[in-house]
Amino acid sequence: MRNWLVLLCPCVLGAALHLWLRLRSPPPARASGAGPADQLALFPQWKSRHYDVVVGVLSARNNHELRNVIRSTWLKHLIQHPSLSQRVLVKFIIGAHGCAVPVEDREDPYSCRLLNITNPVLNQEIEAFSLPEDTSSGISEDRVVSVSFRVLYPIVITSLGVFYDANDVGFQRNITVKLYQAEQEEALFVARFSPPSCGVQVHKLWYKPVEQFILPESFEGTIVWESQDLQGLVSRNLHKVTVNDGGGVLRVITAGEGALPHEFMEGVEGVAGGFIYIIQEGDALLQNLHSRPRRLLDHRSNLHREDALLREESSVYDDIVFVDVVDTYRNVPAKLLNFYRWTVETTSFDLLLKTDDDCYIDLEAVFNRIAHKNLDGPNFWWGNLVLCSDRKGVRLNSGRTAVAPTRSSQLFLTLSFRLNWAVDRTGKWQELEYPSPAYPAFACGSGYVISRDIVHWLAGNAGRLKTYQGEDVSMGIWMAAIGPSRYQDGLWLCEKTCEPGMLSSPQYSPQELTQLWQLKERCGDPCRCEAAAGGF
């Protein structure tokens, strides 16, 4: 018996040691469909030690320099801090996949959609819409009809046109056709059709020339046909006309059956005529298409090198969570939801702080404020809210349309949860699927803190929550469903400014972040220092 015990003791000790090491080891930093994070969800007792705060830093794959600056400034200070180092877990949030399409070949720099132009129609005029030969041209009941489109490669519109009634002899109508740039109230140009001035007949349309402008890539416009008579227009559903996109240089934007119309739509969605256009800079387009295969190969090689660098970086620092998304701006909300899932499934924590890799963060100040203000309750959202109660838009340096605050709104704390922020229908912050003209209140993305129960709710509903154009506005829309207690705090700065006692400040270069932290360490104030020759 003793012999058996002697043999068993090493096995028991080995198993105990293995279990102890397993419990102490950090969870794998990977948030993907059926990866280790999902396996850990089955064994919550194997989570790593408890943290007061988990910090998630949104970071792009190629932002190595910004991450290294953070590691050498506030993160280094945190790791060396005698008490905070054991209370905080910091992870960079990075998409596991790079976009396989080079930036030059994407529809826009914010997504990963291929600019799919093939066999472009060059050096000739193109009719945007045409009717099949066997289509009758009866009058509808609609007196105002509009269609929206997006330009994917520069074009010039030369003429606007209207369908005509085959039963009429000549042109017997009074119709106005206008082209608007999206979100603009004044038409770029107008064509007026009447019996004495009906233009030129081409196929089943009457056309009139207009002043010629180059419509650049990413231009979004709406053509509106309006009958000046009591009769409706000769119009067709978009599915009953042929769209001639010139090989892919433009795309018609439709709301889709059963969906709400876009805000800039007028009247009924459809086509009551057309326009003639030519493709601009055709030779440059052909050259670009010719060089695309070589560019795709080079880009694929660059992605492999980037993957290798990221694997090495993660191995060295062990502070990256790779989430299972393609790393583009449009996918940032999905990155955040995946990180919430990873956090819930692999860690034990009280609060979660979200920030970006171009932000100055003062974690000591964050902890001091948590203790001083008792900011640790349930269903809790601590950030910066800009309160606005009217709809007068203003343009910020960032180019985003905001809403001017009224005097009454400024009676709150130094604010910056953004409220009544206008929804952009074009550009980087374009949002076509949120029907309201303004977003619910949302916090500045430079930094905010949410309670554990909110993180659990977001993680549990990650598969159902719709993502919108930005992670900040998406967060506001998601939070509108649960109505958290908001603590408004202007020390989470929304713009690139420096204030004493600030908790965060965004949009800095690596060199600027280094300077801020050097001032902070030397004088206790990142904004100014008597011994330094200037500050921010």
What does each model-identified segment do?
Residues 98, 108-123, 169-256:
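Aromatic- and Gly/Pro-enriched, solvent-exposed loop/edge beta-strand patches characteristic
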Residues 155-168, 222-225:
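A short beta-strand element within beta-rich, extracytoplasmic domains
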Residues 86, 91-122, 289-350, 424:
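Active-site-proximal specificity loops/subdomain of glycosyltransferases
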Residues 100, 117-138, 312, 329-333, ...:
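Conserved catalytic core of nucleotide-sugar-dependent glycosyltransferases
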Residues 146-156, 167, 210-217, 451:
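Extracellular and analogous surface-interaction loops
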Residues 4-6, 10-18, 280-291, 408, ...:
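C-terminal catalytic/acceptor-binding lobe
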Residues 1-39, 61-64, 70:
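N-terminal signal-anchor transmembrane helix specifying type II single-pass membrane topology
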Residues 145-147, 239-302:
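PGST-rich, cysteine-poor low-complexity/disordered linker and tail segments that act as flexible spacers
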